[in-house]
Amino acid sequence: MMEGLKKRTRKAFGIRKKEKDTDSTGSPDRDGMQPSPHEPPYHSKAECAREGGKKASKKSNGAPNGFYAEIDWERYNSPELDEEGYSIRPEEPGSTKGKHFYSSSESEEEEESHKKFNIKIKPLQSKDVLKNAATVDELKASIGNIALSPSPVRKSPRRSPGAIKRNLSSEEVARPRRSTPTPELTSKKPLDDTLALAPLFGPPLESAFDEQKTEVLLDQPEIWGSGQPINPSMESPKLARPFPTGTPPPLPPKAVPATPPRTGSPLTVATGNDQAATEAKIEKLPSISDLDSIFGPVLSPKSVAVNTEEKWVHFSDASPEHVTPELTPREKVVTPPAASDIPADSPAPGPPGPPGSAGPPGPPGPRHVPSPLNLEEVQKKVAEQTFIKDDYLETLSSPKECGLGQRATPPPPPPPTYRTVVSSPGPGSGSGTGTASGASSPARPATPLVPCSSTTPPPPPPRPPSRPKLPPGKPGVGDVSRPFSPPIHSSSPPPIAPLARAESTSSISSTNSLSAATTPTVENEQPSLVWFDRGKFYLTFEGSSRGPSPLTMGAQDTLPVAAAFTETVNAYFKGADPSKCIVKITGEMVLSFPAGITRHFANNPSPAALTFRVINSSRLEHVLPNPQLLCCDNTQNDANTKEFWVNMPNLMTHLKKVSEQKPQATYYNVDMLKYQVSAQGIQSTPLNLAVNWRCEPGSTDLRIDYKYNTDAMTTAVALNNVQFLVPIDGGVTKLQAVLPPAVWNAEQQRILWKIPDISQKSENGGVGSLLARFQLSEGPSKPSPLVVQFTSEGSTLSGCDIELVGAGYRFSLIKKRFAAGKYLADN
């Protein structure tokens, strides 16, 4: 049979006839394709198919003789019929495979022919698969169309679509033809998809990262704003000669020694575009109400209302001689739902004490010094940070002054950023936004401040490290209560203590930790314990030895309690004159309880009274205990120690309420004390500053001198993440010299220096200078205030410490930190 195949010399697409074995006209049985090895010779009706195959107009593929490029699919869908109505067989191989409708007298010959055919085709098939991978896909698509196309006439059982699809796949590989139109190859789709989706989803991620980078450290995103990078070519070229050229800028005598440029800690130059977020938030930042001559009054009450992230309850530092009316709008604006939680039968707060006569923290002179600052300019040009501890404790003489003013002002809702992860933001989380409130929540009654004594049983044995969970029914140890604390079974239920903020307690688990972009954790000695953000500290217990998990203990175990002192220093430096430095330091002490303590209190309704003593308190002034939770003995003779005990019924009620509102919480932070530290001018600032400007029409020279001051701290600790930000106006066209390297934001016209840490171990003992020269097109520049930010942990500026008195509780952690509030320096 193969003899007839070799007689054909015509080629189709360069393929020899012997490769196209099904195109012979001399063998009717091979008109279309090789028969199946099981296919017998055709008789009766099959003869019509052979006769029809010999006619030039009836080729099996619907094309004239010698043309084998395209298949006439219409012919397959509507096959020709013979005189009796049978369709003429198209001579396709395998179409009747497995269907024996005829005799098998020639089955052996057909099988042998098929074997020879397979021997010849297999190498061609593998070769063509490699060369014509796309053609295979096209043919598969075409065959699929055949299988899905219904025939309008009676189908022949020999034309099974499955058989055609199954047997033609290998045959079509050996017979490459001009394919019918098919969709685009998939190899082109990735590029096309990228181009099509680019306008919808924006540029690729790489370009987004190239265009958006944070300009400053993540501690204060709203201060510096988010930024965009600057090309290295835009960076100011360094001069070959030392800066400044010629005579350095004249500096007045100063307490801060001028030293050579600090180059020990160069910073990576990367700029940012932080205009939108920064300007929007600057408009919302409330200013501190004291030091009005320096920082100015609140510009817009509505801006305070919009800024939900800063709507904390503050202590008011308004003295009777000037109760700032700026706080009144804040009272009207902040109306969280916590007010509804206060029962109507709560005891009335104690009567307000006589007006205090204490003076402001700083020297009285600065009150009358004309302010060199324009607050609007400061808030619009300088990215300020809100430090919420700056509004309270200025002249209150006693905790009783927190009187009735706070009843009308419920605590504000928590900021969305910390609602699920923070329990009690630190220094900024003062209490009631009322005019003269030292409490941390409205309607917080004043507990009688009467001295009392109590006898406490010997302390129980220490809890084993394994923390076995004992039966809850066992009696508690140290079941002592203060005689002046309201009994648990009082006729009127104890008032609910929402404390400072509605979110005063919340989950602090590491799984839902804050995002690094807004509230990073400053890790030093114990990671993830306390983090600082916008002038506030936040306390967690991740990393502490015995407090990271919910409480599981028996009735005889001592309850773990953690404490955190967080302080904020606000300072204003005028030139290099130390006598003009105004300083204000505020702080707060927070206690944190594990969530499991509520179950312990439920099983032990009369727990031991929690008593603690604040030591080294001689530098504290205007100490304001939480009047709803704390009792204080004011008759103590020791001026360096203050003892407090907790109103346990109120504490239990508050913790139970919070546990119901926030069942996911792991720890509950409770504000206990607010205080102000007696400041001694520039000696109380951990970082002394002096700024000098030399403004000319064509250029501006800026020099910033700083000095690390160990005398301001009880324990010398490093200042971390120090940032210096200065706006420069006048149309800066070029940075001629910057030492050490800094970040220049061309759009915001601001320069930023970042120093990882400053301490005694730094170059020159923490003394250094920052220098910059700017070429101007619209000079001269107008001097702008310098804004400085830093954090520090491991010490406080007040030197306070805490210790427990009595049994039943133990401190699992005591944390101390401080940070810069409004830390400004002017020319």
From Swiss-Prot:
Positions of the UniProt region annotated as Disordered: 1-115, 142-205, 223-278, 314-523
Biased composition range(s): Polar residues: 265-276
Domain of life the protein comes from: Eukaryota
Sites bearing Phosphoserine, chain numbering: 78, 104-105, 107, 149, 151, 156, 169, 236, 265, 287, 289, 300, 316, 319, 371, 398, 485
Residues with Phosphothreonine modification: T180, T182, T247, T259, T324, T328, T335, T409
Pfam families cross-referenced by the UniProt entry: muHD (PF10291)
GO annotation terms (biological process): clathrin-dependent endocytosis; energy homeostasis; positive regulation of eating behavior; positive regulation of feeding behavior; positive regulation of multicellular organism growth; positive regulation of receptor-mediated endocytosis; response to dietary excess; response to starvation
MHD domain residues: 558-826
One CC-aspect GO term: cytoplasm
Keyword list, A-Z: Coated pit, Endocytosis, Membrane, Phosphoprotein
Compartments where found: Membrane, Clathrin-coated pit
Alphabetized GO MF terms: microtubule binding; phospholipid binding; SH3 domain binding; tubulin binding
Membrane topology, from the record: Peripheral membrane protein
Biased composition (Pro residues): 245-260, 346-369, 456-474
Biased composition, class Basic and acidic residues, residue ranges: 16-32, 40-54, 314-333, 377-392
Low complexity biased stretches: 336-345, 436-455, 481-491, 498-521
Region listing for Interaction with DPF motifs-containing proteins, in residue ranges: 560-566, 592-594, 666-669, 812-817
Tissue and organ expression note: Specifically expressed in brain (at protein level).
Segments for region (Necessary and sufficient to mediate interaction with CANX): 648-827
Biological role stated in the UniProt entry: May function in clathrin-mediated endocytosis. Has both a membrane binding/tubulating activity and the ability to recruit proteins essential to the formation of functional clathrin-coated pits. Has a preference for membranes enriched in phosphatidylserine and phosphoinositides and is required for the endocytosis of the transferrin receptor. May also bind tubulin. May play a role in the regulation of energy homeostasis.
Subunit-structure text: Interacts with proteins essential or regulating the formation of functional clathrin-coated pits. Interacts with CANX. Interacts with AP2A1. Interacts with EPS15. Interacts with SH3GL3. Interacts with AMPH. Interacts with ITSN1 (via SH3 domains). Interacts with and REPS1.
Name of protein: SH3-containing GRB2-like protein 3-interacting protein 1
